[in-house]
Amino acid sequence: SEEQSYLLNAVNSFLKNQKAFSRFDDVGIDGVLIVDAPGEYSLKDLGISNANIVSISLVSPTTTKERTKKICNASSGFIYYVTLKGVTGSSNVDLEEIKSNVIDLQKNTDLPVMAGFGIKNKEQAESISKVADGVVIGSYLVESIFQAKKTTDYKKIYNYLSEIKSVINK
């Protein structure tokens, strides 16, 4: 599968740097997730333009069905399903609920549905990857990198990622 690069940032960062945004695709950026913008708004609605950059939208377990449809219509890259209620890195992941919600979400869009927030181990990643188009592991990975002090710590991170990749690419 082709690797892609996405930026996650606040809308003002993109608005203040429209010239840079217009050249994102020149430097290999494929899409953006604007964390503080309502998901129902497309990039064009926000006053940001670059025809080659896709938008990623968040849908959570508490998003209403009506709003989910609007968010799916406004997104152009993929839908990022937030797998838990709470903050990223939390630990209360209900795999059966996640899988059911991802399947319901896929009925509202032709876009890929990625699932993340609170995903930390290969068992969770493997289970979710059976229904989702992809799995996002962010906080756990960033935390591991920040805590790494020596080469062997980085090797553990590499091995962790290799294990995750092996179970989701089955």
Show where each model-derived region lies.
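Alpha-helix-loop-beta-strand connector modules within alpha/beta enzyme cores
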Residues: S1-S5, L46-P61, E96-V113, K156-K170
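Hydrophobic faces of well-ordered beta-strands that scaffold small-molecule active sites
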Residues: S5-N9, V32-I34, S55-V59, I79-Y81, ...
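Active-site-adjacent beta->alpha loops and helix N-cap segments on the catalytic face
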Residues: L15-N17, I34-A51, T64-K69, T88-I103, ...
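Catalytic cores of alpha/beta
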Residues: K19-A20, T63-A74, I119-V135
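Non-catalytic positions within long, well-ordered alpha-helices that form the structural scaffold/packing
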Residues: F24-G28, C72, Q106, S129
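Histidine/lysine/aspartate-rich catalytic loop segments that bind and position anionic ligands
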Residues: N52-G89
